[in-house]
Amino acid sequence: MELLKKIFSPLAKTLNYIQNHFKAMLFLLLLFLLFAPTPKDELNTPNLQEIKLTGAIMDATDLVKQINQVTQDNTIKGVLFSVDSPGGAVAPSVEIAYAIKRLSKIKPVIAYASGTMASGSYYASIWADKIIANPGSMIGSIGVIMQGSDFSGIMQKLGIKTQVVKAGKYKQIGTPDRPWKNYEVKELNKVIQATYDMFSRDVANARKLDYKKRDTFANAHIFTALQAKKVGLIDNLGVKYTAKEILVQLSGVKEARWNQEDTFDKIMKKISASTAIVFQTYFPPLTLR
């Protein structure tokens, strides 16, 4: 037994030290990542940048901030807007679209569909100088949807009743405790149709398509990349390398130097994502998907 203790004693001490000083070691690791020497080739000023839109669009604050920063950065000569998103909420999608529109007036922007560029994420991309899509990607779904649930049957079985005091005929619109009334559906449809008109008109203007023929490219059609090109929703098929090469040509840079995301920022984003909590209301969201 004493022999085993002597053999494993150094290992036990090491593990005990790591356990007692984990936070300090993590802090030192973060300091090293922040101040570690930069390779010589990274000391050159970046002249191109990739901005990514991935996942459902629920909030555009960080992405729009990133786009605005690049817009004002004179050292960045062109932007690759990489998209893989099924769409999302209307207002954030519009915010991103108009941020890209402002950016494209100052420097070339290539939007690249790596997997899905549909609904709100397609809206976000329409003002890019060119849209390149992976041959296996899905494009389109230009439409608007609002949906909710009717829990009245379950509530009745559980003996739950809703009590409401309201001012305004439409104030209870979208409630989940009873079927929606015809006048409520009509009111919601008014909003949906107006939003769809805005969406399809912006697409027509940005892509130079005939708005009167919007049923051919909108109407929530889902297209392959090749089909999307035929109806005018994208410019070319290609992989990410293709999109980057086109951006290099449009930006006029002699040597492409891509701006890499800071290592510390990557770590903090992962930590934030793992601890994020999402709150939702019962009111049915208006989404582009």
Say what each PLM segment does.
Residues G120:
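Short acidic active-site motifs
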Residues Y123-A124, I154:
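Hydrophobic/aromatic ligand-binding patch that stacks against planar heteroaromatic rings
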